Amino acid sequence: MKASEMKKGSIVEYNNGTYQIRDIQRSSPQGRGGNVRFRFVMYSVPGGSKLEASFDADEMLTAVELLRREASFSYKDGEAFVFLDEENYTLYTLDAEAIGDNAGYISEGLSGCYVQLIDASPVALQLPQHVVLEVVDTPPELKGGTATKRPKPAKLITGIEVMVPEYITTGERILVNTTTGAFGGRAS
């Protein structure tokens, strides 16, 4: 698979190891005839040691086939997150390093996740596009302060902070985009 076709969360073989791509930066060519380059921030699977590497857009990488199992968040065991396979009731434990920044989107009862397995061992987690989280702290709305929309910070039940419109109040449940971390609307 070409480097330009890789996405966040892809698992690849590189330097005799297996890595998950966590971040991708694209650099544009300077002047004529320059090649587009991609810089990947990758973490070893399993293990979680960080590696940064750059590739030309048409450079080939070997994608690793994963088994994906739909699961829901069950409970937190110390620093580890435990997910329950909704089909055969298998428990999958992923450490905080494997979860990474996604930990801020995981709350009680979260379903629609996919645990990614290599050789029956859980190595990564794919979250749904949007999750529902409760606002636990946000400043009150300023009445008549301005005619323009101003976002305000809101602390969510998992501890992360997102910018929300002024009309959102403490105790409301909101949709949060797990890719961008942005407010996605009120939860129904």
Swiss-Prot record:
Q: Which Pfam families match?
A: EFP, EFP_N, Elong-fact-P_C
GO cellular component terms? Answer: cytoplasm
Return one GO MF term: translation elongation factor activity
Record InterPro entries:
Elong-fact-P_C, NA-bd_OB-fold, Rib_uL2_dom2, Transl_elong_fac_P/YeiP, Transl_elong_KOW-like, Transl_elong_p-like_YeiP, Transl_elong_P/YeiP_cen, Transl_elong_P/YeiP_CS
GO terms for biological process, alphabetical: peptide biosynthetic process
Q: Which family does it belong to?
A: Belongs to the elongation factor P family.
The name this protein goes by in its record:
Elongation factor P-like protein
Instruction: Report the source organism.
Output: Xylella fastidiosa (strain M12)
